[in-house]
C-alpha cells in the first residue's frame, strides 16, 4: 500500500546519524519521517559507552551549536566527564564523557518524541522508489510505500552486515539485530561504488567478577565539564570512576595461539578495520615489540554490572577470548557477559557524493554515517545533521550548505571524504584540520550558531542564549581594552607575584591578559566586576592570548580565498590540460573537484599541477564564463 501521508524528508535508520538527520529536517519545518527497524534502539550506543574525545568533541560541539541532540543527550547521560589535553593549547583540548547507555538512549528518545514535524515508524526499509535518476520514496519490509522527494540513508553497519566470532559467522546488523540484506542488494544495483569495511567490539565483563584491588582509578574532572553550550552540571546524573589495567606477555601468547582461528588472519574477513581503533589481535601482531597494552575499564551505566574493557576489541574464538581476559590483572576470575565480535558491512565510496552529501547519480538520495566510510558516533552525527539539513533545503527548493574547512570540523570531515575518499574507517582528529586554532571546541557556537539560525536549525531559546553570550564577550573585551593599570599602582602590586617582570609603564587589562603568566581570573576583578559566565571569560582570554596566531591563520585563509573563488566547470575536461601526467588526470577525473582549492587538496596534486589548471582556465576564458553563469 501507499501510505496516505506524504513527507518532505524520509530518514532510514535511527542511530546517531539518523537521529540528527531527522531532527535537523524537522527543525527546519519539513514534514519528516524516521524509519527504524526497532524503536527501542533509537540512539543506541552500539560500541563504546562514550561521547567525545580528541577531534570528536569538536564535532559534538558543532552539532550542538546547530541545535542538534548529541551534546544534550550526553549531559543527561554522562557519568564521567574529563577534558583531554587540558595542559595543551585550546585548539586541541577535547571534552570526553563516559555515558550510561540507558540514560543516553532515553534522552535521545525523549528529544525525538517531542520534536514537532517528526513522525516515527517502526519498519525496516527494503527498497527505494527510484524513477529515472530521482528518488521518490521508500518501501518497507511489509510492503508499505512512503513517498518523499528526499531520502537520507543512515544504515550504519546493517547493510549486508556479517558478524564474526572466530571462524564462525552469521548475518547481523549488530549483536541481536538483523541486517539489511534486501536494501543492501537494492543499493548494489545503483551506479555507486561499493566495498566492505570492518569494525569490532570487545567482550563485556561482569563487574562482580572483577578484582579492583590494585587497579588504577580514573575519576572525572572537578568542576565537572558540560558538553552542551546550554548544559549545566545539574543535568548530570551521579558521577562514577573508570579503572586502568594492562595486557601482559601471557595475554599476548594466548592471543597469538588463536591466530590460526582468527577471521582476520585467515582471510575470512575481507573488510578493512579502523586504523586508530585496532583489535587486540591486530595490535599484538603489528606491535610485536610491545609487551603490554593499556585497557580502560569503563562502566556501561549506573544500573548495570556490565563493564566495557576499552582496548581489547576482538573477533577471536570465544575460548581464546575467555583465556586472554582471565590473563589480565583484575580479570583473573572475570565472567564474560557478551563475547566480543567483528562486523563486516557495505560502505559506498564517498567520492560519489556532492558536498551536500547527496549522491551524484540519484537526485534526492543522501548518505550519512558509516555508509560513507566513517567510524564513530560523532562523525556519524555530524554527517547526519548536514544530510538532514540539506535534504530539507532540497525539499524546500533552496541551495545546499556545507561549511568550509576553515569554518568547522564538519567541513573538514566532508571535504576529506569527498576529495580523498577512504579505504579504511575514517576517524576525526584535530591534526586533520589545518585551521584548528580557529576551530576550537569552545567557539563552535560563535562559528556556527548564526548560520544555524539562518537555516532554521536553531530555536529561540538557543538563539537568545547565544546572542546574550556574544554581547557579553564584546562588552567584556571592550571593558578590558579600556581599563588601564599604571606601573607602581595598587593593582600592579597585586599582580607582582605573578609577573615575570614588574610593570614599567601603563598597560590595559587586555594587553596584560596576553601575557602567558596571567589569566582572566587574575585580571577580571582587578578594576571593576568580572563576568560570571565562564564561557564568556574563556573566550575573552583565548582571543587575547592567541590574537597574533589567529590573525595569521585568518590572513592565510584570505590568501587561499583567491583559490576558493576559482571554480572549475562541472564539464571540465582534465585530459585536455597539457603538462598534467596521466596519474594526475585520473585523480582529478575521479574526484571532480568544483574549485581550485579542493583540487589542491587531492593527494598527489602538486602546486605545479594547480598552476597548470589555473593557466588553462584563464586561457580558455572559463573563469569569466563560470562567474557569469553563477
Curated annotation (Swiss-Prot):
One of the protein's GO biological processes: tRNA methylation
GO CC terms: cytosol
Keywords: Cytoplasm, FAD, Flavoprotein, NAD, tRNA processing
Residues reported to bind NAD(+): 273-287
Keyword Cytoplasm applies: yes
PROSITE patterns registered for this protein in UniProt: GIDA_1, GIDA_2
One Pfam entry name: SAM_GIDA_C
InterPro entries xrefs: FAD/NAD-bd_sf, GIDA_C_N, MnmG, MnmG-rel, MnmG-rel_CS, MnmG_C, MnmG_C_subdom, MnmG_C_subdom_sf
Residues given in the record as FAD binding sites: 13-18
Cystine pairings recorded for this chain: none
Cofactor(s) in the UniProt record: FAD
Molecular function terms from GO: flavin adenine dinucleotide binding
Subcellular location: Cytoplasm
Family: Belongs to the MnmG family.
Quaternary structure, from the entry: Homodimer. Heterotetramer of two MnmE and two MnmG subunits.
NCBIfam families, per the entry: mnmG_gidA (TIGR00136)
Job of this protein: NAD-binding protein involved in the addition of a carboxymethylaminomethyl (cmnm) group at the wobble position (U34) of certain tRNAs, forming tRNA-cmnm(5)s(2)U34.
Name of protein: tRNA uridine 5-carboxymethylaminomethyl modification enzyme MnmG
Organism annotation: Teredinibacter turnerae (strain ATCC 39867 / T7901)
